[in-house]
Amino acid sequence: MSLLQSHLLMTLGLICLVHCENLVMMPFDHVSHVNFFVVTAHTLVKEGHSVTFVIAPRHKKTLDKHGLNYITYDSVNGDKSDDLRKAMENDVFGENKEPVSLMTTLSTIKNLVDNQKLDVLGDKGLKQQMDATEFNLAIIDGTLFCRYLYVLAYRHSIPYITLTASDDPLASGVTGLPSVQPLPAFWFTDNMSVTQRLINTFAQFMTLYVLPAVLYPNSIITEYAPNKPAVSMAFLYKQSELVLVNLQDVCLDYPRVTAPHYQMVGGMGAYPPHPLPENIESFIQGAKDGIVIMTFGSIFSKMPDRVLKKFFDAFKVFPKLRFIMRNSETTLKVPDNVLPLNWLPQNDILGHPKTILFITHGGNNGQLEAVYHGVPTLTFPLNGDQFSNAVRMRVKGFGLDLQMKTFTTESLIQNLIELTTNDTFRSKIKRCSAIVKEQMPAQEKVAHWVRHVLKYGSDHLKSHSIDMPLYQLLLLDVMCIMMLGLGIVSLLLTCCCRMVISKCCCRSGRKKIKSE
């Protein structure tokens, strides 16, 4: 080896020592969350970092496919995510038009969280592997249903960043305003009535205090991190070096109050399209009026034939359109203008110039991709934040929405006609697409902020609001003092007025007696 080559290798090694860090990623045990973290991991690998995942064994194929490192934990308590999926499918596609009760849903979720918490935090093999590896930074999914992952990072003294699709500013010490920031579970916009603001405020109080207390009692710290100081779960969440939220607040979502440590990075999975597989491309080229893509996410990859028949009957009315859909099983005869697939490259099809409409469940990632590529949507919200997502697309003029339990073939046909012939939807979402593409790409934002925190830390980004109790953050104590002051002033003025009136009455009474 020449002297020049040796010098070059030493230089590259020094650069790597300075800039390359060992990162661990902890996503929620759900396909869409793992896929989102995989996209983020590729961005960080390009930066030169080493990335390792902590995952359930069922996600190993996904990580192997992408050539990423991982540590697994044993699912000794059973994979209860199927129970949640079946409950959701029954709620959406069941014959009963009444929704599953809130208490039933919460009970299913609590069982899921309890089992996953035991699997992750109670796994001795995982603990040994984490002890044997020195991680510089953890990137943790901030979804409410997997916040036990913060205990894992805390136990092993790993600083961490939160990466989440859940906008939870108050939990991060940011002045989120329930008056203009609707909770994703509701059909509200940022322009709420008094009743809606009351409901929204109460619901945010429940998600901030009640639900976390039920899912994660503070005893979880002393049980699974006995050698660390006993702190609250709320404290652990606030200790995130940074909170990266997978939302696009420039033109898709509603403008909101943020802070330097609370950054919007919506659109990680949206990028210029790659060439499509030959079978998909040839099918698309046969479309005279364009392509419609339909998928309802990883949970609802198949639907009952009685529901699917309504879609097929509507699609037959548009012979010049072609429909690409994700649906794994059906006994129905598939129309000639429909291509069903077990899996489809959603972003790449949305980016195809012939794609004119996206029929979707309203998942956050899918909406961000639709906006990036400027494709109008027809949304069938199924659960969670999808109801709020459907509303924001409608009020911004980017699409329409229908209900899975109540839609008919006729209503679907009417919506398809409106969305494929009315250029207003396309022009509005194309404008939003242009605005989004003018911003720094989400991948670059994430890379920048991770690099920034690794180099400088995050103390300079955080406001004192993080350490303030909620009543101080919302100035409730100041308002109480002001109301008390106003009350005292009002009382004094009332007393003074009574005294003046009383004296005046006394004087007039004396004069009257003298005159008599």
Description of each model-found segment:
Residues 29, 45-320, 332-336, 343, ...:
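Nucleotide-sugar-dependent glycosyltransferase catalytic domains
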Residues 407-424:
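C-terminal "capping" alpha-helix adjacent to the active site of nucleotide-linked donor transferases
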Residues 154, 370-371, 394:
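Short alpha-helix at the nucleotide-sugar/activated-sugar donor binding site of glycosyltransferases
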Residues 2-20:
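Cleavable N-terminal signal peptides of Sec/SRP-targeted secreted and luminal proteins
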